[in-house]
């Protein structure tokens, strides 16, 4: 993408933007929360809508000149309703976390109780971590995965819900590789007479394509990100039934935000249009197949894959059983040097710190966008294993880097 206008006024920024694009083209993105949107979505997010304030909602704006903002937002809403089958959709949240904030504003008062999955077991900061506003505003108790299986302990969750009596139970996770049984979590919510928030930030695309169970129609509120597995404009989304529609809309604006980022809403509209295609369904199916192949490859090499595999787009590896002296950060750094971008991650029963944890999290959404299938993903897994076995081997890093260069040339991005 030519950036001549930026280069004319700010060569430094133009260089950084061009370098970032080149970095993405020349490396393999395996951070589970990242993906590559289409040129069409990029174009929408860089459109003149970035200039437009549109406080309010379609047909009910606080400013004049919003006819095309209304049109774009209405398209995004209609397409989201079709994708996920929701009665009501709000596409204005700036992020998944702000979508969660709006739900909390709707359902809770300060001091009310949240029951959510522990962060080291696959939860998320916005579900009640002490460093997050949720942990500072609400009373939080957390449930865990079964230490033997790595699966959510649904019976333990019901017991904890009965004892803790939460006002809301949060499902949906940032590092949980198995399919979520939303109806079983709803049983726990019913037992406690609590709301149920399903945060599907990571799996919005998988749910839309029908390759993961949907919480829509089960949970009271469903939130998500719109730039991960769904490959739309960056931001968040909220879905609910009509009973909560007005409260949710008021919690987003004016409760949590001012004007929506209309250029991002445009990117959501375009990405949702793409996701309504048969090609997107095939993409989501391949994403899961690729993750399963990656999990099998790592398992075959003797690594400990949390829960024994995956049902979605990500694989979580506990390095301690096979490589007790190796940290996730050491593996992350070695792989980055070779052009494979993933992240160190905490694992259930973590014995190190969040800054230098014992695990790694890898995902296949971006590789699948590039056109990778099982055979190519298996090769990437084998390359990863070479550096996991010795993250300090410079010759191995160089050899893996050469192979990554070949793969990125064979499966180009934005060319």
UniProtKB/Swiss-Prot annotation:
Its cofactor is pyridoxal 5'-phosphate. Pathway: One-carbon metabolism; tetrahydrofolate interconversion; Amino-acid biosynthesis; glycine biosynthesis; glycine from L-serine: step 1/1. Catalyzes the reversible interconversion of serine and glycine with tetrahydrofolate (THF) serving as the one-carbon carrier. Also exhibits THF-independent aldolase activity toward beta-hydroxyamino acids, producing glycine and aldehydes, via a retro-aldol mechanism. It comes from Haloquadratum walsbyi (strain DSM 16790 / HBSQ001). The record marks 227 as: Plays an important role in substrate specificity. PROSITE patterns: SHMT (PS00096). GO terms for cellular component: cytoplasm. One of its GO terms (molecular function) is glycine hydroxymethyltransferase activity. Residues 1-21 are annotated as: Disordered. (6S)-5,6,7,8-tetrahydrofolate binds at residues 119, 123-125, 353-355. Pfam families: SHMT. InterPro entries: PyrdxlP-dep_Trfase, PyrdxlP-dep_Trfase_major, PyrdxlP-dep_Trfase_small, Ser_HO-MeTrfase, Ser_HO-MeTrfase-like, Ser_HO-MeTrfase_PLP_BS, SHMT-like_dom. Its EC number is 2.1.2.1. Belongs to the SHMT family. Homodimer. This is Serine hydroxymethyltransferase. The modification N6-(pyridoxal phosphate)lysine is found at residue 228. Residues 1-10 have a biased composition (Basic and acidic residues). It comes from the Archaea. Keywords: Amino-acid biosynthesis, Cytoplasm, One-carbon metabolism, Pyridoxal phosphate, Transferase. It catalyses: (6R)-5,10-methylene-5,6,7,8-tetrahydrofolate + glycine + H2O = (6S)-5,6,7,8-tetrahydrofolate + L-serine.
């Amino acid at each position: 993408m030519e950036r001549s206008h930026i280069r004319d006024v700010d060569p430094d920024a133009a260089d950084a933007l061009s370098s970032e694009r080149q970095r993405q083209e020349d490396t393999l993105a395996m951070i589970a929360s990242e993906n590559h949107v289409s040129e069409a979505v990029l174009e929408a997010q860089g459109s003149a809508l970035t200039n437009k304030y549109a406080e309010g909602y379609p047909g009910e704006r606080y400013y004049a000149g919003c006819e095309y903002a209304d049109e774009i937002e209405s398209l995004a809403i209609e397409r989201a309703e079709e994708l996920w089958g929701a009665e009501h959709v709000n596409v204005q949240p700036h992020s998944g976390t702000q979508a969660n904030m709006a739900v909390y504003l709707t359902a809770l008062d300060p001091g009310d109780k949240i029951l959510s999955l522990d962060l080291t077991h696959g939860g998320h900061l916005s579900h009640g971590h002490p460093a997050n506003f949720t942990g500072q505003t609400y009373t939080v108790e957390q449930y865990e995965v079964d230490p033997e299986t790595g699966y959510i302990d649904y019976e333990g969750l019901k017991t904890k819900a009965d004892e803790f009596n939460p006002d809301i139970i949060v499902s949906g996770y940032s590092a949980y590789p198995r399919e979520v049984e939303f109806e079983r979590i709803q049983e726990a919510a019913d037992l406690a007479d609590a709301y149920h928030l399903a945060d599907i930030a990571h799996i919005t695309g998988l749910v839309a394509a029908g390759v993961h169970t949907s919480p829509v129609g089960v949970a009271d509120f469903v939130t998500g990100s719109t730039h991960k597995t769904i490959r739309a404009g960056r931001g968040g989304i909220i879905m609910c039934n009509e009973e909560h529609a007005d409260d949710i809309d008021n919690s987003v604006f004016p409760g949590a935000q001012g004007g929506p980022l209309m250029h991002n809403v445009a990117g959501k509209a375009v990405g949702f249009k793409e996701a309504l295609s048969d090609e997107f369904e095939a993409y989501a199916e391949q994403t899961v197949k690729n993750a399963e192949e990656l999990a099998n490859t790592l398992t075959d090499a003797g690594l400990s894959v949390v829960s024994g595999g995956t049902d979605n787009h990500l694989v979580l590896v506990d390095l301690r059983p096979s490589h007790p002296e190796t940290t996730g950060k050491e593996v992350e750094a070695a792989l980055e040097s070779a052009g494979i971008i993933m992240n160190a991650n905490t694992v259930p029963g973590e014995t190190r710190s969040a800054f230098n944890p014992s695990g790694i999290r890898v995902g296949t959404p971006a590789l699948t966008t590039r056109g990778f299938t099982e055979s190519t993903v298996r090769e990437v897994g084998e390359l990863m294993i070479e550096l996991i076995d010795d993250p300090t081997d410079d010759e191995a890093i160089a050899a893996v880097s050469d192979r990554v260069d070949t793969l990125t040339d064979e499966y180009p991005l934005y060319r």
